[in-house]
A protein has these predicted regions:
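Conserved structural core of kinase catalytic domains
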Residues: 73-122
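ATP-binding glycine-rich phosphate-binding loop
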Residues: 2-39, 71
């Protein structure tokens, strides 16, 4: 495992350096550090997963993304790539601004939107950002609740973990997260692409509006499938059942589990007023 020590100076391909200040967090792919880059605080994602460290294709795609630049302001896009060193590499990005919450915190009710306007603004900003990404010929490939930072007061949305973005039709071996992957990926029929992005986007939008997961109702809760790939295929593949399916009731919400008030109500008049304002503003 290639961890960095506090005070380590990391060389970047643009001829500059960044200096590690502290660890911010870690996950399956690597560790995120706070760094000094050009005299300002930034973040450095440093890979520890061997399949990424040893992938020349992943490194090349990451470098290409840096050179191409961000497709929209909502993306916390890679700013600079580290030269391979100290047994690994990584990339520099902006830090998350204050006032933003992980999308997962909304699902857990640890964060709440101030109003419906902010809630729908988050949805529309995310849609607009991915529309631009797809228009430039990219696909995101691994969209899930861990990719979004949202301001609960305004609904302003930021998109992180953009190292998996690649030209549509090209894949670095990333499949996605259970519950967010399109059925055709779950069933092994295709790799992620812009069309499977649409499915993942729909799941994320449903969660942001209703604060519940669209395929995790009574049927899902009755099936212990954490280590059963075949059962996972049934629950999230072509046999999946929408939690609000009008004809199949086996996966309906469960009282005592699906308690978020948005599950049963979202003001239609508020939605209509917001969408009218959105159209009139000429949001680009």
């Amino acid at each position: 495992m290639s961890e960095l020590k506090i005070g380590t100076t990391v060389r970047l391909t643009n001829g500059r350096t960044c200096k590690v200040k502290k660890e911010l967090g870690r996950g399956g792919q690597g560790i995120v550090y706070a760094v000094d880059y050009g005299g300002k605080d930034h973040a450095l994602k440093w890979y520890t997963a061997p399949d990424i460290i040893n992938s020349k294709a992943f490194y090349k795609n990451l470098s290409n993304n840096v050179n191409a630049g961000s497709p929209a302001p909502n993306f916390i896009w890679p700013l600079a790539v580290a030269d391979p060193q100290l047994g690994s590499y990584g990339y520099v990005m902006a830090l998350r601004p204050k006032g933003y919450e992980d999308m997962s915190q909304f699902i857990l009710c640890h964060a709440q939107f101030d109003n419906v306007h902010a809630q729908l603004n988050a949805c529309l900003q995310i849609c607009a950002a991915f529309q631009r990404l797809h228009a430039l010929g990219y696909s995101y490939q691994d969209m899930n609740d861990g990719n979004f930072f949202i301001n609960p007061k305004t609904g302003d949305a930021l998109i992180c973990d953009n190292d998996n973005v690649a030209p549509d039709g090209y894949n670095n071996g990333i499949g996605g997260k259970a519950g967010y992957m399109a059925p055709e990926i779950v069933e092994g029929k295709t790799m992620p692409n812009k069309f499977t992005d649409y499915y993942s986007l729909a799941v994320c939008l449903f969660i942001l509006i209703y604060m519940n997961r669209p395929f995790e109702g009574q049927w899902y809760l009755s099936c212990p499938c954490d280590n059963n790939p075949e059962m996972a295929k049934k629950l999230f593949g072509f046999s999946s059942v929408f939690i609000m399916d009008p004809t199949d009731a086996k996966n309906r919400p469960v009282r005592g589990v699906h308690n978020n008030k948005e599950m049963g109500y979202l003001s239609c008049s508020a939605c209509q007023c917001f969408l009218q304002d959105f159209q009139q503003s000429g949001y680009q």
